[in-house]
């Protein structure tokens, strides 16, 4: 490790240590251990030269705890940072290298247990620097077992209000992924134009419809009361009629968990009074904006949101009393007490309909029997990413489609030895 000459001399009263930069081209492996996890300034001088030298060579680069130039608890990175092939981090993942852009520099992350003493003070210090938790593959095993004498009703009843005249596919993908994620009954409330296609693609679903002249809110209210979980918004469009449908759901008197996605979010961003409806809704509310939708909801620029997604999601969650699922390359899930950052998934999932599939997975986890809805939502995001990673192996990032992701869900569950095996 390189130490400042004067600082070293002052502290331990020995003659100054002299170092020289050795060409990194001479080595097959480079261990990066220059800085700790709390770096909060730009890297300058000889350290900047060393980082440039390390990044120029083809040697395998292994960072200790965190790549030099990154900080554990913040998204912003310094002007110079080591681009590691591997990072061996101690005790737990660090937020600054799980979120982008830091994630691009960490390479494959290996968490090493070095026997941190678990005390209240230690836990508090860890949370101050690294407030977020990362879902792991082993968390899939926490999905509650199904009752041996259960039935389709006890496995979870989901209502999906989705699909306008020209965007029926969103409803189909949400329904398919809800079934693939363990839901017992899925009822789709959609435009009448979508009925035949829905019953062809997802014949297990129950279909109720509205048309251009009649929003059928009386029937919709009845099915809101019936449901254990409601999805509202995918492909719904933004119109007077879709506003009426979303308002009907929020004022239905249902206590079902409500997932607001896509056009439901766009409607809310244009109608401030809907926040009052949300505050009076009896059940738990989950909002699932991508960064563009979050920009419209908050008035922040996309750059501001990407610059600090954890703070953005957490503030929004606390302000409106909802679980926020802020979707991006590293999705953030939070409520007023918990923060999760997703580590699964890949760039091939940036395709139309991927978010609609996610809403179905979230609905599945809401119906699975978890006591903690925020954890269940974060687990759903992780499972969705695992399905995308499976598609990367089978279809590749260039060619995967949202339907492929939905169809890969069952393999994620069976390969991880859940009760769905």
Annotate each predicted stretch with a short phrase:
Residues 1-36, 42-64, 245, 257, ...:
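Nucleotide and nucleotide-moiety/phosphate-recognizing core
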Residues 8-12, 74-76, 198-201, 336-338:
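Short secondary-structure transition/capping segments
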């Amino acid at each position: 490790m390189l130490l400042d000459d004067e600082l070293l001399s002052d502290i331990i009263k020995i003659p100054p240590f002299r170092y020289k930069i050795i060409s990194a081209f001479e080595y097959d492996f480079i261990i990066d251990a220059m800085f700790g996890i709390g770096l909060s300034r730009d890297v300058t001088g000889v350290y900047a030269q060393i980082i440039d030298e390390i990044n120029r060579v083809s040697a395998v680069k292994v960072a200790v705890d965190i790549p030099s130039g990154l900080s554990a608890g913040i998204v912003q990175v310094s002007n110079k940072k080591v681009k590691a092939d591997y990072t061996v981090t101690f005790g737990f993942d660090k937020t600054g290298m799980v979120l982008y852009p830091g994630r691009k520099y960490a390479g494959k992350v290996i968490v090493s247990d070095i026997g941190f003493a678990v005390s209240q003070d230690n836990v508090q210090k860890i949370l101050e620097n690294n407030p977020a938790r990362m879902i792991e593959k082993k968390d899939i095993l926490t999905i509650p077992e199904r009752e041996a004498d259960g039935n389709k009703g006890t496995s979870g009843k989901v209502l999906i209000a989705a699909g306008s005249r020209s965007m029926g596919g969103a409803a189909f993908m949400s329904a398919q992924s809800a079934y693939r994620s363990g839901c017992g009954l899925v009822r789709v409330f959609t435009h009448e134009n979508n009925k035949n296609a829905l019953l062809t693609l997802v014949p297990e679903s129950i279909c109720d419809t509205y048309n251009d002249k009649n929003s059928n809110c009386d029937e919709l209210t009845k099915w809101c009361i019936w449901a254990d979980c409601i999805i509202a918004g995918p492909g719904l469009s933004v119109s007077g009629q879709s506003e009426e449908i979303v308002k009907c759901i929020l004022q239905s008197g249902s206590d079902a968990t409500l997932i607001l996605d896509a056009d439901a979010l766009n409607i809310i961003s244009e109608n401030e009074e809907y926040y009052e409806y949300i505050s009076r809704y009896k059940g738990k509310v989950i909002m699932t904006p991508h960064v563009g939708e979050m920009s419209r909801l908050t008035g922040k620029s996309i750059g501001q949101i990407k610059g600090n997604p954890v703070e953005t999601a957490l503030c929004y969650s606390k302000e409106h009393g909802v679980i926020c699922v802020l979707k991006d390359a590293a999705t953030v899930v939070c409520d007023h007490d918990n923060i999760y950052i997703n580590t699964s998934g890949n760039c091939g999932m940036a395709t139309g309909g991927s978010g609609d599939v996610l809403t179905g997975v979230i609905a599945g986890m809401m119906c699975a029997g978890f006591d903690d809805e925020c954890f269940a939502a974060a687990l759903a995001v992780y499972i969705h990413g695992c399905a995308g990673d499976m598609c990367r192996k089978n279809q590749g990032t260039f060619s995967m489609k949202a339907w492929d992701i939905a169809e890969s869900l069952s393999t994620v569950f069976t390969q991880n030895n859940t009760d769905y095996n």
